[in-house]
């Protein structure tokens, strides 16, 4: 009986020939990522050793640039920690700054066939790179950094096979909203993606879909490796790796097919994304106060390109705030060079530095009482982006940009008729 990609990676990392659902695997961690939030507890100042500084990455993102004295102190602790243990991969405020999962992607820190851990729930973003990546709690991060180990219960796996190609104006976010609306939560399950249609998805699109696996309550989210992925990683990281492919006789809890060509733009209604997706026509015309594009899910260069395409030569509706946050400063620079930033600014958008910012309700776009926002980010539960009375709709960057122009939820289709998104 063969193994899934998740099972293969966990078996290899634990030194076992095989693992099966229900097993507990103690694995070697190839990469441990710490964020600024990791350094809020004072316990990190008391650590006596780091297992392997070359396997540790530190990124300041949730509270960056520091909006409070407490955040500034966390940054200071992180810098001291990096200096004390010789951790060279420190992404401080500056040109190397970014959201942790986006930095991991930009630098190809997540190697195919390996295990990566981070203290953030959206760590499964690295699954786009054929990496078994999971968010873990504070004690488990301490264990990973000091011993190089982590433990996971092996779950059952749901496999999605893609066919076809997305229509113009439909994106990976719409794939997620389709899966979340059709199949609901995947509690205690791994999600794996493959099939002939996968090749039509850009690396950035795969990143979006992998990131949103957290909102399905998935354990791991892993894409099959293909030539595009392997070339992307090798161009950015010289370290050797061994990607994991599923065995032909791998056992899945369920196997599902999705025809990408049949999908359309969707919107998740406020307060939840699971079992909560509707067609845009059902909410079109809903007035909004703010439109946001960013986060580890939708701060990619592809997302900024789509937003710029939609708003080019047009203006954001009066009374509507349109906030755009690139995932990393490197993405910001690339978007600036491509002309996307100028186009967004000309339309009336505000472009912020790379940060989790508005997505986590931290700063740079916090919602006030009773405000309505449409967001291309990670979450829309009550109070996520600010006041608990604010209502948050979730959609693709194209839908968000179209809505910013209208001052109300709008379908992006008219901006993509006759050419590619």
What are these regions (language model features)?
Residues 1-421:
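Fe-S-dependent hydro-lyases/dehydratases of central metabolism
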């Amino acid at each position: 009986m063969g193994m899934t990609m998740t099972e293969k990676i966990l078996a290899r990392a634990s030194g076992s020939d095989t693992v099966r659902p229900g097993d507990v695997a103690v694995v070697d961690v190839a990469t441990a990522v710490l964020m600024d939030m990791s350094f809020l507890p004072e316990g990190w100042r008391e650590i006596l050793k780091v297992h392997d500084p070359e396997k540790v990455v530190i990124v300041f993102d949730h509270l960056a640039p520091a909006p409070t004295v407490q955040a500034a102190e966390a940054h200071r602790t992180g810098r001291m920690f990096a200096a004390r243990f010789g951790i060279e991969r420190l992404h401080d405020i500056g040109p190397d700054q970014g959201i942790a999962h986006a930095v991991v992607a930009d630098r190809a820190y997540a190697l195919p066939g390996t295990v990566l851990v981070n203290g953030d729930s959206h760590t499964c973003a690295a699954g786009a790179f054929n990496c078994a990546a999971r968010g873990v709690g504070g004690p488990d991060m301490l264990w990973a950094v000091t011993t190089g180990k982590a433990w996971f219960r092996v779950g059952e796996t749901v496999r999605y096979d893609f066919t076809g190609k997305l229509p113009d104006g439909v994106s990976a976010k719409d794939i997620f909203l389709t899966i979340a609306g059709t199949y609901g939560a995947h509690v205690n399950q791994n999600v794996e993606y493959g099939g002939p249609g996968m090749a039509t998805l850009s690396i950035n699109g795969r990143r979006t879909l992998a990131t949103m696996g957290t909102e399905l309550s998935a354990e791991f989210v892993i894409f099959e490796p293909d030539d595009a992925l392997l070339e992307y990683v090798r161009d950015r990281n010289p370290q050797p790796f061994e990607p994991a492919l599923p065995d032909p006789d791998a056992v899945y809890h369920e196997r599902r097919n999705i025809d990408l060509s049949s999908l359309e733009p969707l919107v998740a209604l406020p307060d939840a994304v699971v079992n909560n997706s509707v067609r845009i026509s059902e909410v079109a015309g809903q007035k909004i106060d703010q439109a946001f594009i960013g986060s580890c899910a939708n701060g990619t260069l592809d997302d900024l390109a789509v937003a710029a395409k939609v708003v080019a030569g047009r203006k954001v509706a009066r009374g509507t705030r349109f906030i755009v946050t690139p995932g990393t400063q490197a993405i910001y620079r690339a978007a600036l060079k491509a002309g996307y930033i100028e186009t967004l600014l000309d339309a009336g958008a505000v472009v912020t530095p790379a940060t989790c910012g508005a997505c986590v309700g931290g700063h740079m776009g916090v919602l006030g009482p009773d405000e309505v926002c449409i967001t291309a980010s990670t979450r829309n539960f009550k109070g996520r982006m600010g006041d608990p009375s604010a209502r948050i709709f979730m959609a693709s960057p194209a839908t968000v940009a179209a809505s910013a122009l209208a001052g109300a939820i709008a379908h992006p289709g008219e901006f993509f008729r006759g050419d590619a998104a």
